[in-house]
From Swiss-Prot:
Alphabetized CDD domains for the sequence: AHBA_syn
Function per UniProt: Catalyzes the conversion of UDP-4-keto-arabinose (UDP-Ara4O) to UDP-4-amino-4-deoxy-L-arabinose (UDP-L-Ara4N). The modified arabinose is attached to lipid A and is required for resistance to polymyxin and cationic antimicrobial peptides.
Main EC class the enzyme belongs to: transferase
Alphabetical keyword list: Aminotransferase, Antibiotic resistance, Lipid A biosynthesis, Lipid biosynthesis, Lipid metabolism, Lipopolysaccharide biosynthesis, Pyridoxal phosphate, Transferase
Domain of life: Bacteria
Gene3D superfamilies: Aspartate Aminotransferase, domain 1, Type I PLP-dependent aspartate aminotransferase-like (Major domain)
Alphabetical list of Pfam families matching this protein: DegT_DnrJ_EryC1
Organism this protein belongs to: Pectobacterium carotovorum subsp. carotovorum (strain PC1)
Protein name: UDP-4-amino-4-deoxy-L-arabinose--oxoglutarate aminotransferase
Amino acid sequence: MTDFLPFSRPSMGEEEIAAVAEVLRSGWITTGPKCQQLEQAFCQQVGCRQAIAVSSATGGMHVTLMALGIGPGDEVITPSQTWVSTVNMITLLGAEPVMVDVDRHTLMVRPQDIEAAITPKTKAIIPVHYAGAPADLTALRTLSERYGIPLIEDAAHAVGTQYRDEWIGARGTAIFSFHAIKNITCAEGGMVVTDDEALAERIRSLKFHGLGVDAFDRQRQGRKPQAEVVTPGFKYNLADINAAIALVQLDKLPAINARRQQLAARYLTQLRSLPLQPLAVPDYPHLHAWHLFMVRVDETRCGISRDGLMAALQTHGIGTGLHFRAVHTQKYYRERYPHLHLPETEWNSASLMTLPLFPDMQDSDVDRVVVALTSILESVRD
């Protein structure tokens, strides 16, 4: 029987295992020197001024919004075509998520939709760099500066992505994810980067109980042993066990993303004869990280629904993903915003399918997926 091919699998080697073993033997397994090394290495990688390691991108989004003072009575603009955690964090802070539509072909937010949604209550704009490609930062930064509204880039999909000639995260504020399916992973984790030192200081405090320093700073760096709480905070710090894995993965990032690009190019070539619609790449200069390889399944063109095709691929031993069901179509938000209609988002939400893509895949795995797709689509047309 052919082995099951998942849509994603973390790429781990002996280097990651050795890094974890080193931390376990060190006697310091929670937030400590490895986290500091990871933050420094990430700054060097993307060219940012400040990097704050966190236990998840969701936690990073939470404390970033809090650090900006966002709360009841405020509005935050973001696409509905995103993972629900961003909208959850806005909602849990008592602010109002203002969900906007996206480009039908790239899934990127459109600057004109964001500008139309701006009101005197707007306190932040959160674009998403989708599937490994960047949003149009020039236009978004222009809006941010014109209206004096902070821009928070959701860069969960964009480790190793470039916009024009700069790495995502090099300017402004961005939040990355190191979740298990991301381009680099430490099982769970994330990184907030910013060039605003005052904002970074608030985020560092909020992510660790509202203290000015963490335990490693107090015990090993000669800081005051009794740190004071300067504001109520949370516990979103990253452990050194996780940071050690992320450091190894960060070193491997160029090779990881190069392999993803090769696999994506193979998909694009072989899918040309099928009625599936891959996401379009933006037409401005960029370096794609190929976090996800996504196609749209139009039932009229394909003769089968997206869900039907996913089920059929499962019978061939091939896993798929759905990234994502639009937030405003989820039960809680559907009931809260019953009149919200975002046509491009809704069409994509109903037709998106993620195909297997991870760096340990073989070329033959791509071929296997395409052969299965061809067989299924031909059978429903007969």
